[in-house]
């Protein structure tokens, strides 16, 4: 049976794991690392890079390098968070045809789901090269506080990447699964998950294989990226103070500053001070300018203090919704790379009144939990029951624009709730229902998931028709709606037409694009391999020709030289088939050279053998003297 992989699709880094026997195993990528940067780059030559190779060239290609795209997934272009991000990233964020936030590189638009799919493809390839078989099914994690549009967009990304997404699972829940799989005694735990782009906190009761989420809360626009941005802003301000030059509009300098900020942030988790050195950051008429700033841990903590404190409110809300006090939490599990920051650990300890648990790898535990959930769905992992919750209330807009809740937040999923609606006017034949998700009292302040029309209602006085609408949230946290006219018994399955999101046709087109790209990538790889082989043959043939050219006829020598010239010309192009054909032609004509080399070697060996014979015949003239050893004792007797 083919394996189901678990993928932690992160804002900054992604990770893939698979069940290996009874344990989840994190798979190393082609570069030998256990996590892969969630970065996609398009070079000037239209080559697509993913992961570490994309990150390495970011400084020289800021506009073509896409990072932290997860922050845009499922968001509208006019979302205030998108507007904020637009000014901070070097690449272009544009309005998609559906009104969502998309990105643009080299004049081509991509949806965040497409870019995420490219990262998922990289993770899929990583798993396939380890398992030695094709992977088609996956469990993908999302922040617990993701809304329906963001979950749907993540599922779409999986589909574009050629994966059947068996389950979308919340990151803190996945982490709890990996943490508590081998623990039999009952515990109440809090998972504090501060990653690259999002923050979640979940309260769970675990024991005897049952993982029940009691509540969840969070902030989908708070993470390590914000800490980096805060540090970049500080460095820009300090440099301006010192040199009078504003680096804000220099995309190349900003990319270098971002890399340096991330590095400094990581270093300050283990040391009290670091130095940021960026030579030749810019130049003016007086010459090149260098940036050199010493940064202490205390200074960094003061710069990001409000960001750290922003994690406290969701913790309070999660405890309140679970009906618990901080002292009733048995263990606090830290997840996400940002939880390595000492200040974060201090705040967690102060809030929960206990030392946080550090026995899990914060970068890998989510992917491991996803792999375990994959094992559960496949039947390989027995006696595990996962009860998750919906993070946000679901409801509709009623008279006066009020938000009427149908399913409250922190309701265990899957769940179903029905409500009967009627008409507002006589002989009304259609009703428009607008579905929202959120916690505000007015519908307009919440996230519009979409709207649908119930049509074909038989003519009747207002208030008479009885239309039962059922809202159903599946185990992925994705909303489905069905409606039934009680009078006629007619039932409609209604798909919410999201206000944005990708249509089936969009997804189909993107799947085809991804397949075409995979084919193009394969061709490009074949071309590179063919070039490497050809260059190696040219080099070795030229070397042999210089050494043994006098051993072949003038015609053969010319044929070899012509074949080398033809192959060199072919190497200037990208036609892999032509390169292969010319390589084969050179290999064939250079066989004469190989023969000459072989004959020369044999002749040298023959000469060596003759010399050896002469030496042995002269040896025959030497007579070995016989001698007898006499014992000293015998001598004296």
UniProtKB/Swiss-Prot annotation:
SUPFAM superfamilies listed in its UniProt record: Actin-like ATPase domain, Heat shock protein 70kD (HSP70), C-terminal subdomain, Heat shock protein 70kD (HSP70), peptide-binding domain
Region ranges (Disordered): 516-542, 601-637
Modified residues (Phosphothreonine): 198
Keywords per UniProt: ATP-binding, Chaperone, Nucleotide-binding, Phosphoprotein, Stress response
Bias kind Low complexity: ranges: 601-617
Gene3D superfamilies referenced in this protein's UniProt entry, alphabetically: 1.20.1270.10, 3.30.420.40, Actin, Chain A, domain 4 (3.90.640.10), Substrate Binding Domain Of DNAk, Chain A, domain 1 (2.60.34.10)
GO molecular function: ATP binding; ATP-dependent protein folding chaperone; unfolded protein binding
Family the UniProt entry places it in: Belongs to the heat shock protein 70 family.
HAMAP family in alphabetical order: DnaK (MF_00332)
Protein name per the record: Chaperone protein DnaK
Organism: Brucella ovis (strain ATCC 25840 / 63/290 / NCTC 10512)
């Amino acid at each position: 049976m083919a394996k189901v992989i678990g993928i932690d699709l992160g804002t900054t880094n992604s990770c893939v794991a698979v069940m290996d026997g009874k344990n989840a195993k994190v798979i190393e990528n082609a570069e030998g690392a256990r996590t892969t940067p969630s970065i996609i780059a398009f070079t000037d030559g239209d080559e697509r890079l993913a992961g570490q190779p994309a990150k390495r060239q970011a400084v020289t290609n800021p506009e073509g390098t896409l990072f932290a795209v997860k922050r845009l997934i499922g968001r509208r272009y006019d979302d205030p968070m998108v507007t904020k991000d637009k000014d901070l990233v070097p690449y272009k964020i544009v309005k998609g045809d559906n009104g969502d936030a998309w990105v643009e590189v080299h004049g081509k638009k991509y949806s965040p789901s497409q870019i995420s799919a490219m990262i998922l493809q990289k993770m899929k390839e990583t798993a396939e090269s380890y398992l030695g078989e094709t992977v088609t099914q996956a469990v993908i994690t999302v922040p617990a506080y993701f809304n329906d549009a963001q979950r749907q967009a993540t599922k779409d990304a999986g589909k574009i990447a050629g994966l059947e997404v068996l389950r979308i699972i919340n990151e803190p829940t996945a982490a709890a699964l990996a943490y508590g799989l081998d623990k039999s005694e009952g515990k109440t735990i809090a998972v504090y998950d501060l990653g690259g782009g999002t923050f979640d906190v979940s309260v769970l009761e675990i024991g005897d294989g049952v993982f029940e989420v009691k509540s969840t809360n969070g902030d989908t626009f708070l993470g390590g990226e914000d800490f980096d941005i805060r540090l970049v802003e500080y460095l820009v301000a300090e440099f301006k103070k010192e040199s009078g030059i504003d680096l804000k509009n220099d995309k190349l300098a900003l990319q270098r500053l971002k890399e340096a900020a991330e590095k400094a942030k990581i270093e300050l988790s283990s040391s009290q001070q670091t130095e940021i050195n960026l030579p030749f950051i810019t130049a003016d008429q007086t010459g090149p300018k260098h940036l050199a700033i010493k940064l202490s841990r205390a200074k960094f903590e003061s710069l990001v203090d409000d960001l750290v404190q922003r994690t406290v409110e969701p913790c309070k809300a999660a405890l309140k919704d679970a009906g618990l006090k901080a002292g009733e939490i048995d263990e606090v599990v830290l997840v996400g790379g940002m939880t390595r920051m000492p200040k974060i650990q201090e705040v967690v300890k102060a809030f929960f009144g206990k030392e946080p648990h550090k026995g899990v790898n914060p970068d890998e535990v989510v992917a491991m939990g996803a792999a375990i959930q994959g094992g559960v769905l496949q039947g390989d992992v027995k006696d595990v029951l996962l009860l998750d919750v919906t993070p946000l209330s679901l409801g509709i807009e009623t008279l006066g624009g009020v938000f009427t809740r149908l399913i409250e937040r922190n309701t265990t999923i899957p769940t179903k709730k029905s409500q009967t609606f009627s008409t507002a006017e006589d002989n009304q034949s259609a009703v428009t229902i607008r579905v929202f998700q959120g916690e505000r009292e007015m519908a307009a302040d919440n996230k519009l998931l979409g709207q649908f029309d119930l049509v074909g209602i038989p003519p009747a006085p207002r208030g008479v028709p009885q239309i039962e609408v059922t809202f159903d949230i599946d185990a992925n946290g994705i909303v489905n709606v069905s409606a039934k006219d009680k009078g006629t018994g007619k039932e409609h399955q209604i798909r919410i037409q999201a206000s944005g999101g990708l249509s089936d046709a969009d997804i189909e087109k993107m799947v085809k694009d991804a397949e075409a790209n995979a084919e193009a990538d394969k061709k490009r790889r074949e071309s590179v391999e063919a070039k490497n082989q050809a260059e190696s043959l040219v080099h070795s043939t030229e070397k042999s020709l210089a050494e043994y050219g006098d051993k072949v006829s003038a015609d053969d020598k010319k044929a070899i030289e012509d074949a080398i010239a033809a192959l060199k010309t072919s190497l200037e192009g990208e036609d892999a088939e032509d390169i292969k054909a010319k390589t084969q032609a050179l290999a064939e004509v250079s066989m004469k050279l190989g023969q000459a080399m072989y004959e020369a070697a044999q002749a040298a060996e023959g000469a060596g053998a003759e010399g050896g014979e002469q030496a042995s015949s002269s040896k025959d003239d030497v007579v070995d003297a016989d001698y007898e050893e006499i014992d000293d004792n015998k001598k004296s007797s």
